[in-house]
């Protein structure tokens, strides 16, 4: 079973992602609401994929956190964001091992991206 963590500052949205991931056969190892919680969680678990928002509570954005994660380990990151700002989209595309979907998230789109990540 594939393992995931969710890094999202909105609890209800995080819960929805958990349900979607579990319905696709993922084991959700934990959730974090801030960059600091995410760092703690990543020291405790080893996910196969990270589902993350671009904008987080705490000192770091999702983009900064992804860069730090990839400096230590190559865990794919799927950004789920409402932002369509060109600079954000460009920054995500420049990060190796990252992809994004725009909120609201369609279950089929989520599944397609997760399948592509699993194949790589």
Describe these PLM feature segments.
Residues 64, 84-102, 112:
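Alpha4 helix (beta4-alpha4-beta5 surface) of REC/receiver domains from two-component response regulators
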Residues 63-72:
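Short amphipathic alpha-helix used as the core "switch/output" element in two-component signaling
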Residues 8:
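Conserved acidic carboxylate
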Residues 11-30, 95:
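Two-component/phosphorelay signaling modules centered on CheY-like receiver
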Residues 34, 60-64:
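Acidic catalytic/metal-coordinating carboxylates
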Residues 53-54:
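Active-site residues of response regulator receiver
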Residues 106, 115:
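Receiver (REC) domain switch/active-site region of two-component response regulators
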Residues 80-81:
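Hydrophobic/aromatic residues positioned on beta-strands within the core alpha/beta folds
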């Amino acid at each position: 079973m594939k393992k995931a963590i969710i890094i999202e500052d909105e609890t209800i949205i995080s819960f929805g992602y958990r349900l979607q991931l579990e319905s696709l056969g993922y084991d959700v190892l934990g959730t974090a609401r801030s960059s600091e919680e995410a760092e703690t969680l990543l020291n405790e678990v080893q996910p196969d994929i990270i589902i993350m928002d671009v904008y987080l509570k705490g000192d770091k954005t999702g983009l900064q956190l992804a860069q730090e994660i990839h400096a230590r380990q190559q865990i794919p990151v799927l950004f789920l964001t409402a932002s369509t700002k060109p600079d954000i989209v460009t920054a995500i595309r420049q990060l190796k091992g990252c992809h994004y979907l725009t909120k609201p998230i369609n279950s089929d789109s989520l599944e397609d991206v997760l399948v592509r990540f699993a194949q790589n």
